[in-house]
Regions:
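Generic structural signal for well-ordered alpha-helices
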Residues: 98, 136, 164-171, 195, ...
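Conserved C-terminal portion of the radical SAM core fold
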Residues: 151, 205, 231-295, 304-334, ...
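Radical SAM enzyme core and accessory elements
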Residues: 1-52, 337-342, 351-482
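Core AdoMet radical
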Residues: 117-134, 138-240, 246-256, 278-285, ...
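Canonical Radical SAM [4Fe-4S] cluster-binding loop centered on the CxxxCxxC motif
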Residues: 90-91, 95-131
């Protein structure tokens, strides 16, 4: 029997099955222990310091107790705390991005994904570089600046060379005032050498969903293909960081396994990255199993109700206060709105989850990875966020100013990142409004920018931001940043 060790590089030790089961038992035993719950909540509260703000975060056991808690007033207190922590680290900014699917060729047999190799219904597509150019121009014409590229695992069709060439193509395209300034990458677990190549290509965050942390379930859900190797997949983030990638993104596909198990495993993975590399996950994604071609979410026994889903989001924010939390267009407008109040800091907008989908007038369903619930345009999403009091941010400055990895975390964990992110969000929002927004969205947006500029505490920084906003409005000058 292996022993739990967050500093180990062996998957069975840093994601330890026995420790997860003991954690779930401990949480169940203490789910109405008010004294313990209060002490956990107090530990997690933001504390002001001479350098800004400090948040302790929680261990996987402490976080699991909060998740298990079913005392209504304590759950409400958790939700308020999650929002308070989100405000302390990220303010009212919401980072915008879009996925770009390059290829749905795949050699794996994942039973929850329509790209699995046995699916004969789905239309297999791999974009050429010219087609990628067309997709990127379509995304730029919406106003997007940040992409997450996606591809199935196929060493022939989707080689690392193809991925690298695609990244180079994406960064090279500047259409009108458009530009993609950050490319995040969501591809299969690979080698240290290949992660070095991705680093050299200038990627932002490397994202890899664990799918499930339960090894027995994992092997059943991935019966064939290279992804069947649980250890290789689970240890991928360590290889990525060894390869020089500063920012990594975690996530599980909720609904495949019991949510208590997945939550504990996710928290342990975050603790492991902190223990070994001194840097926790840059992002955590919270997708749920959704309907797609050849996939019925009702076939899985662990589907997640909205109230549990919301509670998970709040507990992640409280436990890992510095992480960027992502929710995609898998979820409806109503669910996404609730999640914004519980700690989500990044959302996708106007997403197409099919290969080549952005250049199609009609949403192509025959190559989608999952059905999109929120089908609004980017302008509608931006308008909606501003009506709710949020600042839609298209900023990518940290990545290009070297604020990544431990440098980003040192600023984020003290709340000092707001000194850069707040004005940068306003300037990139101004770019969006001038270049892409509808008249109604412009009106709301410029009023919001003026109100938010007045909140910048440093007089010099406020004046620089004002001057830059004026320059964006009156010229084609773009890409100002702190």
């Amino acid at each position: 029997m292996s022993i739990y060790n967050p500093k180990s590089l062996k998957a069975e030790e840093f994601i330890n099955h026995e420790e997860i089961l003991e954690t779930i038992e401990y949480a169940e035993k203490n789910k109405r222990n008010v004294e313990l719950i209060d002490s956990i909540l107090n530990k997690a509260r933001p504390q002001k310091t001479e350098h800004g703000v400090h948040c302790e975060g929680l261990t996987h056991r402490e976080a699991s107790v909060l998740l298990a808690c079913d005392i209504p007033e304590k759950v409400e207190e958790m939700y308020k705390l999650a929002n308070e922590i989100k405000q302390a680290f990220y303010g009212n900014r919401i980072v915008m991005f879009a996925p770009l699917y390059l290829s749905n060729y795949c050699v794996n047999g994942c039973v929850y994904c329509p790209y699995h190799m046995k699916n004969k219904h789905i239309k297999r597509i791999k974009l050429t570089q010219d087609q990628i150019r067309d997709e990127v121009i379509a995304l730029q014409d919406m106003g997007h600046k940040r992409l997450a590229i996606e591809a199935g695992e196929d060493p022939v069709h989707n080689s690392i060379e193809y991925i690298l060439e695609s990244i180079k193509t994406i960064y090279s395209i500047q259409h009108k005032n458009g530009a993609i300034r950050r490319v995040n990458v969501n591809i299969a677990a690979t080698t240290v050498e290949n992660y070095r190549k991705l680093k050299e290509a200038g990627i932002g965050t490397y994202i890899l969903f664990q799918e499930t942390y339960n090894k027995e379930s994992y092997l059943e859900l991935h019966p064939t293909g290279p992804k069947h190797d649980y250890d290789y997949h689970t240890e991928a983030m360590d290889r990525a960081m060894e390869g020089g990638i500063d920012d990594v993104g975690l996530g599980v596909l909720f609904g495949l396994e019991g949510y208590q198990y997945e939550f504990a495993g996710l928290m342990m993975h975050a603790e492991h990255l902190e223990a070994v590399h001194g840097v926790g996950p840059h992002t955590i994604s919270v997708p749920r199993v959704k309907h797609a071609d050849d996939i019925d979410p009702e076939a899985f026994d662990n589907s997640l109700a909205d109230d549990i889903f919301e509670k998970i989001a709040a507990c992640i924010r409280i436990a890992v206060p510095y992480t960027g939390m992502i929710i995609s267009t898998r979820e409806s407008q109503e669910v996404r709105e609730k999640m914004l109040h519980l700690g989500v800091s990044q959302i996708s907008g106007a997403s197409r989850t099919s290969v080549g989908g952005y250049t199609e007038e009609e949403r192509p369903h025959d190559s989608e990875q999952f059905d999109v619930s929120d089908q609004r345009t980017l302008d509608e999403v931006v308008n909606w966020l501003m009506e709710l009091g949020y600042i839609p941010s298209f900023c990518t400055a940290c990545y290009r100013e070297g604020r990544t990895g431990d440098r980003f975390m040192s600023l984020c964990k003290t709340g000092q990142i707001q000194n850069c992110c707040h004005p940068n969000a306003l300037m990139t929002l101004c770019e969006y409004l001038v270049d892409y927004a509808s008249e109604d969205t412009k009106k709301i947006g410029f009023e919001l920018i003026e109100k938010e500029l007045n909140k910048i505490p440093n007089a010099k920084a406020q004046q620089i931001a004002r001057d830059n906003v004026d320059a964006i409005k009156s010229s084609n000058r773009r890409d100002f940043r702190f």
